[in-house]
């Protein structure tokens, strides 16, 4: 096992009679040196990264359109992950007052959805009483969302993205009276919150739930590369009016992206939207 750790870790291993061998030290610059007996070789980190990355670039060139593979290859070293956590963050879970009732949350999913368990767990840890709601529950009328204060539309590939991302899922709401009525009644109330993640975000865009007062609504378009993009990046949270994100203003946090249709096409100027975060680099 090879890993990087502070020098204090050596004492921990010694206490447990575990033998370790130091093979190197972290460096600040671009050049690093490998020593083997009397032989000493110095390499450029940037050059080796390009060599390592080239195979991925060649494969990417066969898949990505509009020069995105070349742009990715030229820019990947300039896109450093930088984080800035809120000053009040201590890494501890919130203390939930067991004497108070938990607000009710519903995790909404469709065939082909995933990550509903992860969202349910996160909501439970945040203090919600969580229930699982499948679209068949809403379509049949078994679930009306009455008494629910928070809904979360999960990610995945609902209906295998046939006809487009979340198109079929949106249709299940639009063309089934009971599901449509349940959703409309939920958003008419003033004591509700909602979140759409990944495919759930695409769903809310398709249903025109974002800035419903606009005459022309935004859409999610295919990525410029014309292919599914998945990667880890960072976003900076701006000043915003979000109940869930306003306290994170000024922070830069890591996020996963994973979409085929992940490009927002917004018809109005930025000031017409409550954009809570932007990519930490262009």
Located regions from the model:
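Beta-strand->loop->alpha-helix junctions that form or flank phosphate-binding loops
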Residues: 1, 12-38, 131-137, 218-227, ...
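Intein/HINT protein-splicing elements and their conserved insertion hotspots or analogous self-processing inserts
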Residues: 6-104, 112
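Amide-donor transfer/coupling interface in amidating biosynthetic enzymes
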Residues: 23, 141-143, 180, 184-187, ...
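Residues that mark the start of a beta-strand
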Residues: 102-104, 129, 254
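Short helix-loop-beta junction
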Residues: 117-132
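Short acidic/histidine-rich motifs immediately flanking catalytic phosphotransfer sites
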Residues: 144-152
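Cysteine-nucleophile active-site neighborhood
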Residues: 154-242
